[in-house]
Amino acid sequence: MMKNSTYLSICIPAFGRLEYIINTLASIYKDAEDQTIPLADFEVIVSDNDPDKELEKLKELFPYQNFKYFNTDCEGFMNSFYALTYAEGSFLKLHNSQEIFKKGSLKVLLSLVKEHMKDKNVLFFSGGLLKKGKTFTAGSFDEFIQKTSYLSSWSNAFGIWKEDFDSVKDGIDLNKLFPHTSLLFTQNNKRKYIVNDSSLFSTQFVSKRGGHNKFQAFTIEYPSILDKAVIEGDITALTKSKVIRQLMNEFLPSLFFNVKIAQRETYDYVGFKENLKRHFPKGAYCKIVLLSLFAPANIIWRKIRIKFLK
């Protein structure tokens, strides 16, 4: 084993939402206690980019040796990158502040990390959203992106080995909305890609989420990462087309419903119709609006499926 005995770093970028993060941290430490997992096996890092440092009180609430709080001077989603820079474990996993650990999840994460300490295969945690409910393997980066589709953009699924992170962190051109996805796409020459699609976490509902143009993020920024991967030969044009199709048929209708119809979320919508013309097929806007009418049924079914995944 490596000199560093910390296998796993759970890296949580955060800005406010104290009550949610308290629940998340409590679930991690409760799971460790219930499963008798030594605190030395993992560390928990909170990178707080709020200048007011509201989350600094977490140090008093969670006085564990393996808990670390940092106030970070960075903008928006770049905090996902900086959270990783503080980590000292062998494997660095990003974790969304509102995602609560289910019973036994920490053990699953640690087991996978220990299993792949030598081969350093990519480990990806899709949370049951791929409808598999089990662990499966992809033999190439193109196959991996084809199978994970737009979930390759999900920060909570992302993880990277520290030695791989250290080798790319200084020279990488990061997308400011998807820095973790930029990092993921540097891991294009691995022998295997291990996707754990178990439902390991439950999401705390955050009312009226918003704050940025999420429509632009998924019509311009994320597709541009796919474009670059096609140009550099890391994925095929066919794989990119499949991901774009699934964004159009699944993700964007759900987002449109939540923002424009149900108004459960407050993401900026400016430029959506025009932005679709750059990467999406003709008629994409009308199709998304039509499919958004079926979004409630799809959302309910997805929640039921994830809840009962074993």
Where are the model-predicted features located?
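Cell-envelope/extracellular polymer assembly enzymes that use nucleotide-activated donors
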Residues: 6-11, 43
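Short, well-formed alpha-helical segments that are part of the catalytic scaffolds
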Residues: 17-33
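A conserved acidic beta->alpha catalytic loop
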Residues: 45-57
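Glycine-rich, basic loop-to-helix element that forms the pyrophosphate-binding segment
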Residues: 71-87
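Short aromatic/hydrophobic "clamp" motif used to bind/position activated sugar donors
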Residues: 92
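Conserved donor NDP-sugar-binding/catalytic core segment of glycosyltransferases
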Residues: 100, 104-137
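Conserved nucleotide-sugar donor-binding catalytic segment
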Residues: 137-217
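C-terminal subregions of glycosyltransferases and related glycan-biosynthesis enzymes
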Residues: 182-185, 189, 195-310
